[in-house]
Structures are given as C-alpha cells and as structure tokens.
C-alpha cells in the first residue's frame, strides 16, 4: 500500500481545502441563479414545459 513519505503542511492543506470550497460556492451561486431565472421566467438557456391549467 502506498504511504506518503512526509506530512502535508497545514498551509498546503488549507490551500487545497479553500480551492474545494471555492468550487462548491461557485456551483451553489450558479444553481441559485438558474433557479431564480426559472422562477421569474427570464431563463434563456433552460427550457421548462409549461402546463396550462384552465377550468371549464
């Protein structure tokens, strides 16, 4: 089994963790933006089938 030779420094660990967090934050911002545009009907890149409910 492969074993690392030296311990990873705290600063390197923090840098990698921050990169991972930044990617997650960006994904959440994009998802929220898409949800907002869908709810207002201003979406130009995502198509939703609208069901018209009319009472007769």
Curated annotation (Swiss-Prot):
Q: Which family does it belong to?
A: Belongs to the bacterial ribosomal protein bL32 family.
Q: Which GO terms describe its biological process?
A: translation
Enumerate the GO terms in the molecular function aspect.
Answer: structural constituent of ribosome
InterPro entries to which the protein is assigned, alphabetical: Ribosomal_bL32, Ribosomal_bL32_plant/cyanobact, Ribosomal_zn-bd
Keywords of the record: Chloroplast, Plastid, Ribonucleoprotein, Ribosomal protein
Q: Specify where it is mainly localized.
A: plastid
Which locations, inside or outside the cell, does it occupy? Plastid, Chloroplast
Q: Which GO terms describe its cellular component?
A: chloroplast; large ribosomal subunit
Query: Is Ribosomal protein among the key words of this record?
Result: yes
Q: Name one Pfam family in it.
A: Ribosomal_L32p
Q: What is this protein called?
A: Large ribosomal subunit protein bL32c
